[in-house]
Protein backbone atom coordinates (compact mmCIF):
# COMPACT_ATOMS: atom_id res chain seq x y z
CA UNK A 1 0.00 0.00 0.00
CA UNK A 2 0.97 3.60 0.58
CA UNK A 3 2.72 3.00 3.89
CA UNK A 4 -0.10 3.54 6.41
CA UNK A 5 1.03 0.61 8.56
CA UNK A 6 4.68 1.64 8.27
CA UNK A 7 3.83 5.19 9.35
CA UNK A 8 1.84 3.86 12.32
CA UNK A 9 4.77 1.65 13.33
CA UNK A 10 7.18 4.59 13.08
CA UNK A 11 4.89 6.81 15.17
CA UNK A 12 5.07 4.21 17.95
CA UNK A 13 8.72 3.20 17.41
CA UNK A 14 10.54 5.84 15.33
CA UNK A 15 13.89 4.05 15.19
CA UNK A 16 12.56 0.68 13.99
CA UNK A 17 13.53 -0.43 10.51
CA UNK A 18 10.58 -2.01 8.71
CA UNK A 19 11.07 -4.68 6.05
CA UNK A 20 8.15 -4.78 3.63
CA UNK A 21 6.79 -6.28 0.43
CA UNK A 22 4.64 -4.56 -2.17
CA UNK A 23 3.31 -5.82 -5.51
CA UNK A 24 2.14 -2.56 -7.11
CA UNK A 25 4.96 -0.63 -8.86
CA UNK A 26 3.54 2.83 -8.01
CA UNK A 27 3.33 1.88 -4.32
CA UNK A 28 6.85 0.40 -4.39
CA UNK A 29 8.11 3.69 -5.80
CA UNK A 30 6.39 5.60 -2.99
CA UNK A 31 7.69 3.24 -0.28
CA UNK A 32 11.26 3.93 -1.45
CA UNK A 33 10.77 7.52 -0.22
CA UNK A 34 10.13 6.48 3.40
CA UNK A 35 12.89 6.42 6.02
CA UNK A 36 13.84 3.26 7.92
CA UNK A 37 12.22 1.02 5.31
CA UNK A 38 13.78 -1.91 3.50
CA UNK A 39 11.71 -2.83 0.47
CA UNK A 40 12.15 -6.54 -0.18
CA UNK A 41 10.88 -8.60 -3.08
CA UNK A 42 7.58 -7.69 -4.72
CA UNK A 43 5.77 -10.89 -3.82
CA UNK A 44 5.88 -12.14 -0.24
CA UNK A 45 4.52 -15.54 -1.26
CA UNK A 46 7.48 -16.22 -3.56
CA UNK A 47 10.23 -15.08 -1.17
CA UNK A 48 11.27 -17.73 1.33
CA UNK A 49 13.96 -15.72 3.11
CA UNK A 50 13.69 -14.52 6.68
CA UNK A 51 12.08 -15.31 9.97
CA UNK A 52 10.66 -12.59 12.15
CA UNK A 53 9.74 -11.90 15.76
CA UNK A 54 7.00 -9.48 14.71
CA UNK A 55 4.90 -9.40 11.55
CA UNK A 56 2.30 -6.71 10.87
CA UNK A 57 0.48 -6.99 7.57
CA UNK A 58 -2.44 -5.95 5.41
CA UNK A 59 -2.37 -8.61 2.67
CA UNK A 60 -4.56 -8.52 -0.45
CA UNK A 61 -8.09 -9.81 0.20
CA UNK A 62 -9.21 -11.07 -3.22
CA UNK A 63 -9.39 -14.80 -3.83
CA UNK A 64 -8.66 -15.63 -0.17
CA UNK A 65 -5.12 -14.29 -0.56
CA UNK A 66 -5.37 -12.80 2.92
CA UNK A 67 -5.75 -16.15 4.65
CA UNK A 68 -3.05 -17.72 2.47
CA UNK A 69 -0.71 -14.90 3.45
CA UNK A 70 -1.51 -15.28 7.16
CA UNK A 71 -0.59 -18.95 7.06
CA UNK A 72 2.66 -18.22 5.18
CA UNK A 73 3.49 -15.43 7.62
CA UNK A 74 2.95 -17.79 10.53
CA UNK A 75 5.49 -20.15 8.96
CA UNK A 76 7.99 -17.26 8.92
CA UNK A 77 7.27 -16.32 12.52
CA UNK A 78 9.90 -17.24 15.09
CA UNK A 79 8.88 -19.14 18.21
CA UNK A 80 7.68 -16.52 20.71
CA UNK A 81 6.88 -14.08 17.90
CA UNK A 82 3.64 -12.21 17.21
CA UNK A 83 1.73 -11.87 13.95
CA UNK A 84 -0.97 -9.23 13.43
CA UNK A 85 -2.78 -9.06 10.10
CA UNK A 86 -5.75 -7.17 8.74
CA UNK A 87 -7.98 -9.53 6.77
CA UNK A 88 -11.33 -9.56 5.06
CA UNK A 89 -14.35 -10.88 6.93
CA UNK A 90 -15.11 -13.35 4.15
CA UNK A 91 -13.24 -16.29 5.72
CA UNK A 92 -15.18 -15.90 8.97
CA UNK A 93 -18.49 -16.94 7.37
CA UNK A 94 -17.66 -18.64 4.05
CA UNK A 95 -18.39 -22.32 3.49
CA UNK A 96 -15.40 -22.85 1.17
CA UNK A 97 -13.04 -25.57 2.36
CA UNK A 98 -10.10 -23.16 2.47
CA UNK A 99 -12.03 -20.83 4.79
CA UNK A 100 -13.24 -23.65 7.04
CA UNK A 101 -9.69 -25.00 7.24
CA UNK A 102 -8.41 -21.52 8.13
CA UNK A 103 -10.96 -21.13 10.94
CA UNK A 104 -9.97 -24.53 12.33
CA UNK A 105 -6.27 -23.74 12.00
CA UNK A 106 -6.77 -20.43 13.84
CA UNK A 107 -8.26 -22.35 16.76
CA UNK A 108 -5.30 -24.75 16.75
CA UNK A 109 -2.76 -21.91 16.93
CA UNK A 110 -4.90 -19.99 19.46
CA UNK A 111 -5.35 -17.03 17.14
CA UNK A 112 -7.38 -14.07 18.33
CA UNK A 113 -9.81 -12.34 16.00
CA UNK A 114 -11.14 -8.80 16.34
CA UNK A 115 -13.78 -7.17 14.14
CA UNK A 116 -12.88 -3.81 12.65
CA UNK A 117 -15.81 -1.55 11.80
CA UNK A 118 -16.59 -0.52 8.25
CA UNK A 119 -15.13 2.92 7.67
CA UNK A 120 -12.24 2.47 10.09
CA UNK A 121 -9.81 2.81 7.15
CA UNK A 122 -11.74 5.56 5.38
CA UNK A 123 -8.59 7.76 5.32
CA UNK A 124 -6.91 5.05 3.22
CA UNK A 125 -9.76 5.06 0.72
CA UNK A 126 -11.78 2.04 1.85
CA UNK A 127 -14.89 1.54 3.93
CA UNK A 128 -14.93 -2.26 3.87
CA UNK A 129 -15.42 -4.18 7.13
CA UNK A 130 -12.31 -6.08 8.14
CA UNK A 131 -10.87 -8.31 10.85
CA UNK A 132 -7.64 -8.18 12.82
CA UNK A 133 -6.04 -11.59 13.31
CA UNK A 134 -3.41 -11.80 16.06
CA UNK A 135 -1.37 -14.94 16.67
CA UNK A 136 1.43 -15.53 19.17
CA UNK A 137 3.63 -18.48 18.27
Which residues fall in each region the model found?
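Class I S-adenosyl-L-methionine-dependent methyltransferase catalytic core
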Residues: 1-137
Amino acid sequence: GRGALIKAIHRACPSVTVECYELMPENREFLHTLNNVILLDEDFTKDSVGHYTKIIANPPFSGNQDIEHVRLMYDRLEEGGTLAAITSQHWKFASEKKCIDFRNWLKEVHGEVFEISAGEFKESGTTVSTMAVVIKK
